[in-house]
Amino acid sequence: MSNKQFLELPYGKDDFPLLREGNCYFVDKTPYLKTVFTDQSAVLLFTRPRRFGKTLLISMFDSFLKINPEKPFDNSKQLELFKGTKILEDKEFCDKFMGQCPVITITLKKVEGTNFKEFYESFASAVHKVASRYSYLKNSDKLDKSDKEELENLTTKSYLLKIENQQTVKDALSTLSGLLYKEYGRRAILLIDEYDVPLAAASYRDRVNKVLYKNRHDFVADCHEKMVAFMKGFFDLLKTTPGDEGAISKAVITGCLKEDKNSLFTGVNNFKVNTVLATNKDLTGIIGFTKDETYKFLKDYELENFSEKVKEHYDGYKFCDKEMFCPWDVVNFIDENYKYNLNGETDSIRTNNYWLGTTSDKSLYDYLGYLTDSDNKKMQDLVDGKSISFKLNESMNYDTLSEHNSDDFWSLLLHTGYLTLDWEKSDDEELSKDHSTNKNVFARIPNLEILECFSSNIKERFSSDFKERNLHNKLVDAFSCGNQKEIYDIFFDMLQKYVSIRDTATKAPLENYYHGFLNGIFTSCEKLVSEYHSNYESGNGYPDITFKAERNTKAVIIEIKATSNEEDMDELATNALSQIEEKNYEQPFIKQSKITEIYAYGLVFCKKDCLVFCKKLK
C-alpha cells in the first residue's frame, strides 16, 4: 500500500477560496486570467455544458481580481491564495490586476419558480445576496445621501422581494457599479455565472404549466417571456460605454446556451462569444479538463493504469484543437476508486455514470415523444456510433424548444454536452460563419457515459408513453390468455415509434436492450401483475421474465432472443420455447394448485420488428 499523502479531492467544490484554503487538488487554470482580461472585448460569453467547471472559473476570477475593502489595493490575500500557481510568474499582469479591481459577481444557477412571481423573488434574492457584500459602503464618505439610500434598498431583502420594486432589481448592477466607481475611482468588472439558468427553468415551467392548466382557458404560460423582458433590463448595463455613469470595464459571463442576440443581448457592443464550436485556440481549454490535465490527475492518485478506461467512458469531447473531459466525471471517478486501487482491490474499480439524473435530462426526455421518422434515424445512427448532420442554431431561445424543431433539438444537445462536434466531418467554411447564421455541422455522442444517458432516457420514455396510452391493461390481458396477435401489435407499434438503443459500443449481447425495454414496460404494469421476476432462478435455469396475473391464477414465462437477421427469427422463437420446456422453467408454477393456466412465450426482436411464439403449458 502506498505511503503517499494525497490532497483532498475537490468533490463538489466550486468556491475557489474554499478549495485552496482546504488544500484540495487543483487543476491550474490561472494562465487564462491574462488571456481573458487582456482581451479587448468588452463582454465575453463562454458557453459550455453543465458540470464543466464554469462556476469555479468565475470564482477564481473573482478571487484574483477583487479589491479587499479592508485594505484597498493590497494583494497580500491573493498572494497567499494563489501561491504556487502559474499566474504569479507574470508579475506585470499581477501588479496591474491582482486585488486591484472592483468586482461584482453574481450566480443565477439557483433561480427557480413555478410562476413569474416566484421566479422574480428567487432572482431578487440572488441580487440581495450580491448587494449585501457592499454594505460597508454605507459608511463611505465618498457616497452622498441618495447613493446610500439606493444601497439601503438593495440590501433590504423585504424591499427587493416586492414585485412592484422590480426596477430597483433591474438597475442593481448599474447602481452597484456606479457606487464602486465613486469609492475606488475604477470601473468595475462584472462576472455572471450561469446566466441562462433562469431562462431554461422558466421555459421548462411553461411546458409543465401548459399540461397542468390545459383545461383553464384563461391561463397563459408566460414565465419565459416575462423573464426575458425582465432580464433584458437587468443586462442593460452591458450596453453602456466607458463614459456612462455606472459603466463597467469588462464583463465575463458563463452559461450553456447563447440566447438569441436579438432578444437578451440586443444592443451589446464589442461582444465576443466562445462556444463549444469556437476556433480560438487561446481559450478552448479554459473550461473542462484537457487530456493532459486529466492524465496527470489520474497519475497523481496512482490511477494512471486506468487512463484508457476513463478516456473510453468520459472523454470524446472535442473543443477545436483539444480533447476535453468533464471535470465532474473525473473527480467522481477518482473519489470513488483511488482507495480501492491503494488497497489492491482493483476488481472493485468501476466507471459509473455521474451525469444521469441531473436536470438537463429533461430536455432530452421531453422531446422524445415528438421524434419524426427522420429524427429516429438520426438517433439510431448516434447510438450506433455514427455522426449525424443538422443545421446548428448558435443563437437559439429556450422557449423555441416547445416548437419541437429538429435542428433546435440537436443544437441543444450539442450545447449541453449530449453531443460533441465531429470536427473532421464538419466543414471549416461552415464553422467560420457568423454566430447569427445557422451552420451545417456533424456531431456524435462523445462517450459511453452519454450513450447510457440516451439509452436510459429513451427506455424511460417507453414506459411513460405506455402509461399515457393505457396499453398496460391490454398487454397483461394478452399475455394472460395467449393472444399472440395483440402482443405483436403493441410491441410492433412501440418499436416503430421509438429508436432501439443497441449497446454496440459496450459489446453487450443484443438481447440486453430488449430485455431492458420489456422491464421498463412491465414496470408500468405493476398493479396488474405479481411476483414479477427478471433473470430469477426457476426450474433448472434463469428465465428472462416471469410473472403472475389475474389474481395469481395465470403464470407467464418469457424467453427473449434477438438477431440482426430476419431469416433467423422463426428458428430463434422455436428455440426460445424449447429452452423454457427443456429447463423446466414452468415447474415452480405447475406445483401451485391456484394457477390454472401457464403460458410460455418465445419473443424474438430484429431491429424494429418482433415475432411472438406462444405455447400453453397448463
Identify the residue ranges that each predicted region occupies.
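Extended alpha-helical interface modules used as scaffolds for assembling large macromolecular complexes
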Residues: F271-K272, V276, F325-N584, I595, ...
